[in-house]
């Protein structure tokens, strides 16, 4: 009877750890960081010899029982979304388990409550619209032109929701979003609701379709030798980029037939104080767009502002190339996010995402490629440069995390 009770307890412990790990991954944490938190929680809950196996889109836990049997627990996980508040709540649960405030009886309910937190879609829509407006101003659009990306982003988000509801494959959803944003942008300019060029709205919408959280987590997992997780995230990014290529090719081909006035590839440069201000506002809006509350909005503004100051100093003051400036700024962002995360309950990757999206995305480069494409000349150089910057951002942030870990002398398995 005693052996039976002990086995039941071990099974309960394994199920709790598996539930916690799956929750962290579904909320948007990298696999390596989720395993680090899960390992600490497992030890505190009484599982000393637990093995975590990376299987990409599923997580596997193996634990040896005293009778010599090895029990395996697996959970499917989604890697395509991020819920900042859910992630914060689950991180708090991990801290409470580590501090002994939660045990095997109380932890399951705490995990379930954390996983039940959902983001308000309408607030997320408002946050995305404000973020698109701020990015457009940083690209160089005037106030009336910047209204276009904000309105277009609403239609893009609605198209994404509809596609998700009727289970259209993501590749085609993204392609449809690319085409919808072009149609809406053209309609807004033709009706006079916003000022031209409408290509600014298209460029900003295309940039925001790139799943930047997946790029960050992909690099983190690759650095920590979790190849299957990194490959699964790479596939997610590739599907989104493939959709942009399909939809973008259709937009450019049709646009060449109907666009009489080719967009000017040069735009005005936003004054430095305004560039910094809208980076701050954009980061705060991005926090809202990703389900963040006031506890995230203000820190997001801080990291967005600091990242923008670094990037503007490098690009305007030192006239550094965009890719190099973005990479160096991303390293600083990773450092700041790690140290700030020590004071908050959000993972460093969440804070890094806020600052990156608001201050470092290569919106102007995408716009220049789009404007060049409408002239009949390939804009592939600009598109490849934009893709390079997106990858450099992920690598830079991951490097910042690694440097911060060395400074703090944290073990290699401990999450930043």
Q: Can you name each region flagged by the protein language model?
A:
Residues 1-113:
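Soluble N-terminal domains of membrane-associated systems
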Residues 217-287:
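Membrane-embedded hairpin module used as a gating/binding unit in multi-pass transport
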Residues 117-218, 287-290, 294:
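Core alpha-helical transmembrane segments of integral membrane proteins
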Residues 193-197, 255-269, 372-382:
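Membrane-interface helix termini and inter-helical loops of multi-pass transporters
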Residues 134-139, 155-164, 180, 184-192, ...:
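Alpha-helical membrane-inserting segments
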Residues 123, 136-152, 197-211, 262-278, ...:
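Structural signature of hydrophobic alpha-helical transmembrane segments
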Residues 201-205, 217-241, 272-274, 298-416:
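C-terminal transmembrane helix-loop-helix hairpin of multi-pass membrane proteins
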Residues 93-108, 122-132, 147-160, 252-258, ...:
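Hydrophobic, membrane-facing alpha-helical anchors
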């Amino acid at each position: 009877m005693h052996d039976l009770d002990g086995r039941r307890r071990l099974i309960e412990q394994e199920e709790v750890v598996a539930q916690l790990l799956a929750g962290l991954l579904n909320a948007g944490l990298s696999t390596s960081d989720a395993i680090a938190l899960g390992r600490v929680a497992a030890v505190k809950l009484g599982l000393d010899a637990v093995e975590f196996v990376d299987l990409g889109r599923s997580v596997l836990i193996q634990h040896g029982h005293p009778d010599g049997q090895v029990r395996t627990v697996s959970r499917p996980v989604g890697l395509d979304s991020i819920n900042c508040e859910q992630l914060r709540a689950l991180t708090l649960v991990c801290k409470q388990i580590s501090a002994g405030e939660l045990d095997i009886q109380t932890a399951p309910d705490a995990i379930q409550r954390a996983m039940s937190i959902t983001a308000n879609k309408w607030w997320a829509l408002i946050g995305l619209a404000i973020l698109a407006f701020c990015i457009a101003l940083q690209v160089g659009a005037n106030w009336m032109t910047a209204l276009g990306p904000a309105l277009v982003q609403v239609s893009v988000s609605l198209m994404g929701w509809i596609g998700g509801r009727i289970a259209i494959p993501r590749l085609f959803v993204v392609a449809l979003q690319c085409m919808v944003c072009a149609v809406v942008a053209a309609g807004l300019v033709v009706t006079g609701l916003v000022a031209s060029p409408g290509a600014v709205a298209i460029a900003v919408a295309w940039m925001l379709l790139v799943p930047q959280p997946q790029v960050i987590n992909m690099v983190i997992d690759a650095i920590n030798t979790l190849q299957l997780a990194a490959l699964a995230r790479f596939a997610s990014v590739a599907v989104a980029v493939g959709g942009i290529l399909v939809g973008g090719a259709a937009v450019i081909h049709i646009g060449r037939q109907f666009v009489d006035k080719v967009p000017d590839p040069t735009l005005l440069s936003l004054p430095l104080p305004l560039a910094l201000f809208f980076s701050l506002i954009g980061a705060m809006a991005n926090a809202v767009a990703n389900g963040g509350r006031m506890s995230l909005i203000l820190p997001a503004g801080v990291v967005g502002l600091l990242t923008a100051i670094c990037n503007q100093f490098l690009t305007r003051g030192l006239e550094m190339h965009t890719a190099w400036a973005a990479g160096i700024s991303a390293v600083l962002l990773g450092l700041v996010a790690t140290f700030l995360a020590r004071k908050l309950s959000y993972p460093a990757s969440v804070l890094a995402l806020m600052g990156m999206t608001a201050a470092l995305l290569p919106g102007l480069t995408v716009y220049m490629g789009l404007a060049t494409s409408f002239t009949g000349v390939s804009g592939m150089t600009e598109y490849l440069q934009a893709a390079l910057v997106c990858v450099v951002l992920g690598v830079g942030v991951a490097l910042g995390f690694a440097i911060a870990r060395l400074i703090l002398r944290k073990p290699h398995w401990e999450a930043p």
